[in-house]
Regions:
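Short beta-strand segments within Ig-like beta-sandwich modules, predominantly Fibronectin type-III
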Residues: 89, 190, 358, 431-435, ...
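Surface-exposed, short loops/turns at beta-strand junctions within beta-sandwich domains
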Residues: 444-450, 530-535, 618-623
Length: 648
């Protein structure tokens, strides 16, 4: 019978499918999530790197264990005290083999040490030995490689706690070793033991669970025994009263709970099929699929809807049924439902509930969208599950596209051939094609902002990470046009200001492309206006992310030339008078703009700007002539008397 173990651990629950992988979530500063990073926190489940054929998992204080179907063990996370068992004290962000182990049938991770149960009924252990956690009589402070627990055989179940361990023997008794200052060895003493000692008075034991400093045993009749630390009432010792007689009256006074107990005592709960022990709380799974909890509730880990406090009375976890397995972490709790989903409650600042938030929860909440889960494990501040492999996205190319969608995006990663859906944020991809286990091609849907590209498999959805980002780039926007008007003949250099102008592929004045353009920056383009028809047009800029929308700030006006004054406006008939012409729509420079005095053309025409030109008058007969400005094929309209010149 599998059971949940511990504080900083959990029990190794058995799983089935040979292709099963592991998901992890929560705190990761020591690499205990096994995803190849030490990204501090993951608030939703993500895949542990490179694991398949997993049958059981266990989570320790800052390390994790996985049992494979071939009877070997993988470990990852903190290794300062050798708890990974690979002969070093170097931590690992990905699973590594525990050398020399084979025929393993169960694993259990304590706070800073590890256990493995072999098929021959013996137990191997490694990691810290400060309090005799290795149980081998070994006098050193740690072992970086597995050592045999001394004098132990016929073991059928193991559970590693904060700094002690429990084992269930095939004859229905239980044994313990390690720290004992709180009575957690259950042998009637409060002393540590470097070798296994019998837990006093227990028979017909079917499962054991080691918590932070307390132990639980499930008996064959469905009852539970507890021992060890009781500072948060985690032993579930029933309340007792003493009788006080004063002046003929009888009073009942509640007796204080003991701080600990070195021998097992009964917990008032029946019909139990599994037990789990956290740092300072305890759990029992009933045959009805309900869960009972008692002990410390400072982080809402009892799941009964209350916040804070503690209780020695087992109470039902709110709204939970159909549970098939339970797991107690340090101050959080997990439950596996019959449909393969996971619920969690309690402490959550580090994301160990897996629901995408950092808020504690006094009632069960879903751990993301995990599905098909077959086993769960709760560590000090992280969680694990076994089930169909999750995908991991490691790259997105291109990493940006238009808000209108439609871009073809190559997604790289792991287990992508198992994909049943691809999402850009909350929106499904327009379509996707599985190219290989490491590549998917997807069509980006419409969207805005920066989103995570996620892959859904039978096990759930890939965890968001820094490499799965896709940015929806807005189309360019024009905020300013300088100058706002120019001659219809074209050829004017226009400065276009705005946003998102980098990478421009086209600039148009109305429907006509600019003669040329230069992208100065993401906020500026210089464009040469094409010839146009007198009147306003909208300038537009096109980039790979779309075309700028029409606004009042992109208006450019093509002007016919006008004459508003001639200075002087009279001169001798032989010509040669230098005249300054004021108006608009002139082409700066020499040669583009001409002026007609009647039918005769002025000479030496130079336009200093679009509003001022100088010229020399041709010869003319005495009288008044209309002057016309011509820019290319465009001719100014009559505007007497401002455009009239008098020959004297």
């Amino acid at each position: 019978m599998s059971i949940a173990a511990v504080l900083v651990l959990l029990s190794a629950a058995s799983a089935g499918a040979s292709s099963n992988g592991v998901a992890s979530w929560g705190y990761n500063a020591s690499g205990q999530l096994g995803n190849g990073t030490t990204t501090t926190i993951s608030r939703v489940p993500g895949a542990v790197s490179g694991l398949s054929g997993v049958t059981a998992v266990s989570a320790g204080g800052e390390h994790s264990l996985a049992l494979l179907s071939d009877g070997t063990v993988r470990a990852w996370g903190n290794n300062r005290l050798g708890q990974l068992g690979n002969g070093t004290t170097t931590g690992s962000k990905v699973p590594v083999a525990v050398p020399g182990l084979s025929g393993v049938v169960a694993v259990s991770a304590g706070k800073q040490f590890s256990l493995a149960l072999l098929s021959n009924g013996t137990v191997m252990t490694w990691g810290t030995n400060e309090d005799g956690e290795l149980g081998s009589g070994f006098k050193g402070t740690k072992s970086t490689a597995p050592v045999l627990v001394k004098g132990l055989s016929g073991v059928s179940a193991i559970s590693a706690g904060g700094n002690f361990s429990l084992a269930r023997l095939s004859n229905g008794t239980a044994t313990a070793w390690g720290a004992g200052d709180e009575g957690q060895l259950g042998n009637g003493k409060k002393l540590k033991s470097t070798t296994p000692v019998a837990v006093k008075g227990l028979t017909e034991v079917v499962a054991v669970a080691a918590g932070g400093e307390h132990g639980l045993a499930l008996l064959a009749n469905g009852t539970v025994m507890s021992w060890g630390c009781n500072i948060s009432l985690q032993l579930g010792i029933p309340t007792t009263y003493k009788v006080i007689k004063e002046e003929g009256e009888i009073f009942y006074e509640e007796e204080e709970q003991p701080e600990n107990s070195a021998v097992p005592g009964a917990v008032p709960v029946n019909g139990v099929t599994a037990v789990a022990a956290g740092s300072e709380h305890s759990l029992a799974l009933l045959g009805t699929g309900e869960v009972m909890a008692w002990g410390g509730n400072g982080s809402d880990q009892l799941g009964n809807g209350t916040q804070g406090g503690m209780t020695n009375v087992p109470s039902a976890v709110s709204g939970l049924g159909g549970v098939t397995a339970i797991a107690a972490g340090g101050q959080h709790t997990l439950a596996l439902l019959s449909g393969g989903s996971v619920e969690a409650w309690g402490y959550n600042p580090d994301g160990q509930l897996g629901n995408g938030t950092n808020l504690n929860s006094p009632v069960p909440v879903a751990s993301s969208d995990l599905s098909g889960v077959t086993a769960i494990a709760g560590g000090g501040v992280h969680s694990l599950s076994v089930g169909p492999p999750l995908a991991t996205v490691t790259g997105v190319s291109p990493s940006a596209g238009a808000q209108t969608g439609g871009a073809s995006v190559a997604i790289s990663g792991v287990n992508l051939d198992l994909a049943s859906a691809v999402h850009f944020g909350a929106s499904p991809a327009g379509a996707f094609t599985i190219e290989s286990p490491t590549t998917i091609t997807a069509t980006a849907p419409p969207g805005v902002g920066i989103v995570d590209v996620t892959i859904t498999t039978a096990g759930g959805t890939s965890a968001p990470n820094a490499t799965d980002k896709y940015t929806y780039v807005p189309p360019p926007a024009i905020t300013k046009v300088t100058p706002k008007k120019a001659p219809a003949v074209g050829g004017t250099t226009v400065t276009i200001g705005g946003t998102g102008l980098a990478g421009a592929t086209a600039v148009s004045f109305g429907a006509t492309p600019a003669q040329s353009f230069t992208v100065n920056s993401s906020t500026s383009i210089s464009a040469v206006s094409p010839p146009g028809t007198a009147g306003p047009v909208d300038i537009s800029v096109t980039t790979p992310y779309g075309t700028s929308a029409i606004t009042t700030t992109d208006v450019f006006k093509y002007e016919l030339p006008t004459i508003t004054s001639l200075t002087p406006n009279a001169g001798p008939g032989q010509g040669g008078t230098i005249v300054t012409v004021h108006g608009s729509g002139y082409a700066p420079g020499a040669g583009t703009t001409t002026f007609k005095f009647g039918k005769a053309s002025a000479t030496s025409v130079t336009c200093e700007s679009t509003t001022t030109c100088t010229l020399t008058t041709p010869a003319g007969k005495a009288g008044v002539l209309d002057v016309r400005a011509l820019v290319g094929k465009y001719k100014s309209l009559e505007n007497p008397p401002a455009d009239q010149f008098t020959y004297e």
